Amino acid sequence: MLSRSMKDLLTMLKQHGINDERLLEAMSKVPRELFIDEALSHKAYENTALPIGNGQTISQPYIVAKMTSLLELQATDSVLEIGTGSGYQTAVLANLVHHVSSVERIKILQWQAKRRFKHLDLHNISTRHGDGWEGWVSKGPFNAIIVTACATEVPQRLLMQLADGGRMIIPVGEQQQMLKFIRRLGNDFHYQSIEAVRFVPLIAGELA
């Protein structure tokens, strides 16, 4: 039985053009209040980004849904996520695909996210404390890559971890950020600009 707040969230997503029933069902299975501080739980189903500590945020539900829908995910897919953060986006992905490999540079966030995945009985997720710019070579190649922090440029190491036909969604830019969709076809990469966004920066090398 879905709560009134969850129903309202799903209705809002539909009004914003999110009509993929598999995606909406996946989001309905992930209680957003588990991924934020208890003091902010009254805002859990608002369409807004919220702080999760360590200078990081949980993205607004619309952006989570939009980025996920652009990846054209199949149940058999293997997905790389750069920036586990709270784990909310990871959990949505895990309800849609065969396996999610997620990299987080802040150890405490990785640890907290792993506890949430266990609580939700999600066992098709691997997490790693590492540099997102490097990806996770040994787990690849990936059918899809989602980057949840803004890079100054598209990391070449991530492009090389896309399988043929693979899709990537990534915010790129400095003062002005643009959500980019990239599809790999053989050794060619096709780029498409989606919309202006606002994400925390994808920091290279500095593990915390």
From Swiss-Prot:
InterPro entries in UniProt: PCMT, SAM-dependent_MTases_sf
Cellular localization per UniProt: Cytoplasm
Entry superkingdom: Bacteria
Main location: cytoplasm
Protein EC: 2.1.1.77
PROSITE patterns: PCMT
Coiled coil: none
Family designation: Belongs to the methyltransferase superfamily. L-isoaspartyl/D-aspartyl protein methyltransferase family.
Protein name in the entry: Protein-L-isoaspartate O-methyltransferase
